[in-house]
Amino acid sequence: MSAHYFNPQEMINKTIIFDERPAASVASSFHVAYGIDKNFLFGCGVSITSVLLHNNDVSFVFHVFIDAIPEADIQRLAQLAKSYRTCIQIHLVNCERLKALPTTKNWSIAMYFRFVIADYFIDQQDKILYLDADIACQGNLKPLITMDLANNVAAVVTERDANWWSLRGQSLQCNELEKGYFNSGVLLINTLAWAQESVSAKAMSMLADKAVVSRLTYMDQDILNLILSGKVKFIDAKYNTQFSLNYELKKSFVCPINDETVLIHYVGPTKPWHYWAGYPSAQPFIKAKEASPWKNEPLMRPVNSNYARYCAKHNFKQNKPINGIMNYIYYFYLKIIK
């Protein structure tokens, strides 16, 4: 059944393919997709590496949907494909139809690429795995690859707890969400059911409605929860273990990452590729970085006042007071010149 709201021929300006798979594995390959802008390229490359490191008996095709990509990163992705004998496809997205959609200071229009991605695979793949670029894999994905989605549009993991679901349900005026509000960073998508539900068309219609948009906090995620309410399969939290590295600033917290965790989702503004994220909880990302073409890339420094403030806080937490003072000075400098 073909029901593309976003026609691949219109939405993809160019596709660059690096296919280093052994011929025997091509037919059985499983498809994993990311939707990013250039700010998440570092994370995306390392995320792909982490999947490969922990699933070396699986043949993959990785798809990176992005609006523009530097040549240096194209070459790194080519090197990654060659090193791990995998396939990586870079899809350059035409963003014209997305430019009118609402964005926030933290999320660009790249958050809507997941709709383009799901439509792209209609009639091509029965099932695909969408991952946010701030996810590190440390376990076996075969249970997801073989999972029967039945008539569900997607398999998902809930976000936070029942109290949070209730609050989101109230804000979004959808009582069904009290049974479960999901995080959209990991989506195992049933492309046939997605097409039958016209998910992308419904999403774009809702995002054009000011009354609906006024109720949204997490644009794409809230919309997906509204459209897919009662049409998703909730799966174990180990497949989207959400953890903010800013929890490390607290006096005490419970880290949900353990040996059973398969996919770690580093939610929040501090990412594992930031130099101030030097905690054991970021090590799964760092280990994958060291096994990737980004191994010699320095961890990122703060590029705006918000990051400078978090950087300073983490410096003090890590007993680096000189760095903390310098970054607070940098924070105030950035605030003044803004």
Where are these regions (language model features)?
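GT-A fold catalytic core of metal-dependent nucleotide-sugar glycosyltransferases
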Residues: H91-E96, A110-W165, Y181-E197
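Active-site-proximal specificity loops/subdomain of glycosyltransferases
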Residues: D73-Y120
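A glycosyltransferase accessory/donor-loop signature
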Residues: M1-F30, I36, T191-K338
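Hydrophobic targeting segments
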Residues: H31-Y34, V51, V61-V64, I264
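Short internal beta-strands
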Residues: F60-A68, A155-V157
